[in-house]
Amino acid sequence: MSMTKIPLAGVMGAPIAHSKSPQLHRHWLETYGISGFYVPMEVKAADVEHVLRTLPKMGFVGLNVTLPHKEAVLKLADQITDRARLIGAANTLTFGKDGEIHADNTDGYGFLENLRSGATDWTPSQGPAVVLGAGGAARAVIVALLDAGVPEIILTNRTRARSDQLQSDFGNRVRVMDWTQISGVLHEAQLLVNTTSLGMVGKPEMEASLDGLQAHTTVTDLVYNPLKTRLLEVAEEKGCVTVDGLGMLLHQGVPGFERWFGRRPDVTDATRAAVLG
């Protein structure tokens, strides 16, 4: 008598205790009555390759990857999606039957799905997007926005050199502005995105001037702790449509869950409540 294997998946990072992914995937497993497990794993940098070679032999079908391993796993992958290659990092791994590693990055997908569900009147072709920050999250957002058809991205970061590097990587659809001058271009923006940690619990507040922000601009913040950052509060006061950052986390988990467990999950109010709870 053959026994059906129960699929195993998880999330790997260091530290890992803060991750919301276990609550998210366990909620979906329970909601859809799927036999499967999703486990958090704290893994040191020196052990990443060994873990990735071992997990498929233990019955794991895939893995989410969080900081600081998102770039390292890309170098160990056998197959890499175009978007993961452009971003230079992977957050979703799927293991083949012989242990081969397929690497993807669903951060940009999650960002766009969250934006589209929270700001239904926003369309990419409306006009420029102003992006605050130039780290890994900014790369994912830029790749997604350019691919969606945003005509221009105005990029600013407290360290100018990092913005210049992204402009060099992505070309003339990205324009770099000094952090201190951003208020002067906000009136152009159809979309404003904060990809920095400013405004997060335990981090400094957003100090960039928002004087030029107009009511026609959609504003979204990747920070989700707190759900309503100072940036979103100011934007609401100015009449802007705002979108918090929690939905990006939820939506980026959809493709991996579908690949590992065979069911495409929905992101609902119950999903948000399960992760926040």
Swiss-Prot record:
Annotated keywords: Amino-acid biosynthesis, Aromatic amino acid biosynthesis, NADP, Oxidoreductase
Positions bound to shikimate: 19-21, 66, 91, 107, 224
GO MF entries: NADP binding; shikimate 3-dehydrogenase (NADP+) activity
Gene Ontology biological process terms, A to Z: amino acid biosynthetic process; aromatic amino acid family biosynthetic process; chorismate biosynthetic process; shikimate metabolic process
Source taxon at top rank: Bacteria
Entry binding sites for NADP(+): 82, 133-137, 157-162, 222, 245
Family annotation (Pfam families): SDH_C (PF18317), Shikimate_DH (PF01488), Shikimate_dh_N (PF08501)
Active site: residue positions: 70 (proton acceptor)
Family to which this protein belongs: Belongs to the shikimate dehydrogenase family.
Quaternary data: Homodimer.
Function in brief: Involved in the biosynthesis of the chorismate, which leads to the biosynthesis of aromatic amino acids. Catalyzes the reversible NADPH linked reduction of 3-dehydroshikimate (DHSA) to yield shikimate (SA).
Protein name: Shikimate dehydrogenase (NADP(+))
Organism, as annotated: Roseobacter denitrificans (strain ATCC 33942 / OCh 114) (Erythrobacter sp. (strain OCh 114))
Gene that produces this protein: aroE
